[in-house]
Amino acid sequence: MKTILIAFISIAFINSTIILTENKKGEINGYFYELWYEDYNGKVKMSINENNFTCSWKNIDYVDFQYGKNIEPSKTLDELGNVTINYEAQINAEGDIMFGINGWAYMYESFNIIEYYNDEFVPPGTSLGTLFIDDGEYEIYYDEKPVQLNIHGINKAIIFSSVRKEKRLKGTINFNKHFQSWKKKGCKFEYISRLSLLIDGNKSKGNAIVNQIAINYKQK
């Protein structure tokens, strides 16, 4: 009887949908998920299944939905091999929103590959020129932001971004080509510690369906 009960509980967990309505993070089948937002007077919801999720938000100053992979320990691009991200989504939103890939290299070092955005979107930093990847033209941006460490000092966060000019909600991203292009523009990032698909809203409202997420790299 005990064996049957344990099997039943396991199946129920696998087939269930994880629903978030407050700041929270967790893991499902090797991927992490995270919901973070400001202004608790608004409403947010994130419903997560394996390799897909839906989300909605309104009356929120800032919201961040993520689904991706933590790479522990951090690895170089040579160690990861050919890194690709396959995705497909539908977004219906008003205001400043962006959709794409977010990642961390090391503490205070991050990067974005932005595939879709609304008219209110503000480019992230100073333009370093353009490049052609994945049958599309991207503009590269560099930005620095102060980070208050403690009362004794301030560090700076360094961010490199690729912003696709012809927006899309379905495709395959060749991460290596973006990373190598940032290097040519002065990027000194050495390690990759996190890769995620990101929906980011700033003073906006909307909903989204992410039908597919697959982050592929060599795992040892």
Describe these PLM feature segments.
Residues 67-133:
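Extracellular-facing segments of soluble proteins and assemblies that are Gly/Ser/Thr-biased and enriched
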Residues 17-80, 86:
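Beta-strand-rich luminal/extracellular ectodomains of secretory-pathway glycoproteins
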Residues 21, 36-38, 45-49, 56-60, ...:
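A structural detector for beta-sheet-dominated domains
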Residues 2-16:
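Cleavable N-terminal signal peptides of Sec/SRP-targeted secreted and luminal proteins
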Residues 106-168:
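An exposed acidic His-Trp-rich patch
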Residues 14, 88-95, 104-107, 165, ...:
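Short, flexible beta-strand-to-coil junctions
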Residues 68-76, 144-189:
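Beta-sandwich interaction modules
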Residues 169-220:
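Long, compositionally biased interface segments
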